């Protein structure tokens, strides 16, 4: 990890084994925040998931990245389905509670008032008040440092009056002002 010059603010390198360098790279990314809900083996869980995104329009597919040591990981494998609830900017507290605690230690549903409603096509409850709720069926997995769960949407609902919660540099944000698109010549 080196800076290209004293006057240059860039940090560059290929030492991805260096935790601080990886953290610096990660903190330059911008993501939304989703709450993953799952029911399996007679239990339910909710997990904050920063790495959640749409990956296909037709068919409508999403992916989430979940570390293998998370309790949610094995539940997702067993269930083969999950709820993907993209947080509104009013739900940072729900993200914080579900992202700061593990089902290995505590029942997160008891730590906060997670407003839920019954799903239409899956077993897991859905989180009320989200900007987008997607009921998903897993169609594949790919193991990296985390496991990518690739899923097809089987039901969705969204609220166009709400604004998404944004995560950057370890902090929550509201969506800001629109940057005008430049004119194409």
Predicted regions and their residues:
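Basic, polyanion-binding surface patches
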Residues: 2-185
